Amino acid sequence: MNSNTVSSFQDILKRMSKMQLGSSSEDLNGIITQFESLKLYRDSLGEAVMRMGDLYSLQNRNGKWREQLSQKFEEIRWLIEEVRHRLRITENSFEQITFMQALQLLLEVEQEIRTFSFQLI
C-alpha cells in the first residue's frame, strides 16, 4: 500500500476517534469500524495483486471473491454517503476538514480497489 494512503487512514481514524470522544451525541463507531475494515480489505487485496503466483487459489475462490468485492463497493458507497451527510450537517471546521479528507481518501481507495480487482480478474 502507498505510504501516503497508510498515513491518511491512520490520520483520519485518529481524528474521528477524537471527534467521537468530544461528542457523545454523534455516534461515529459505525464509520470508524467501516474505515478500519476497508483499510484491512484494501491491504489484503494489494497483497494478493503482489502475489500473482497465487493465481490458482484465487481462481478456486473466485466466486466468493467477486461477492466480497461487490460487498466492499457497497460499503464504500455507504461510507461516501455517510461522510457527505456529516459534512453537510457539521459546522465545526475540524470536523469539516476531517470529513473532506475522509471523502477524498474514500474516492482514492475506491479507485485503487477497482484497479487491483481488474488486475486479479
From Swiss-Prot:
Localization recorded for this chain is: Virion; Host nucleus
Broad class of the protein's primary localization: virion
The record's listing under InterPro entries reads: Flu_NS2
Motif (Nuclear export signal) positions are 12-21, 85-94
UniProt KW keywords: Host nucleus, Host-virus interaction, Transport, Virion
Q: In which family does this protein belong, per the annotation?
A: Belongs to the influenza viruses NEP family.
Query: Could you describe the subunit structure of this protein?
Result: Interacts with protein M1. May interact with host nucleoporin RAB/HRB and exportin XPO1/CRM1.
Protein name per UniProt: Nuclear export protein
Q: Which gene encodes it?
A: NS
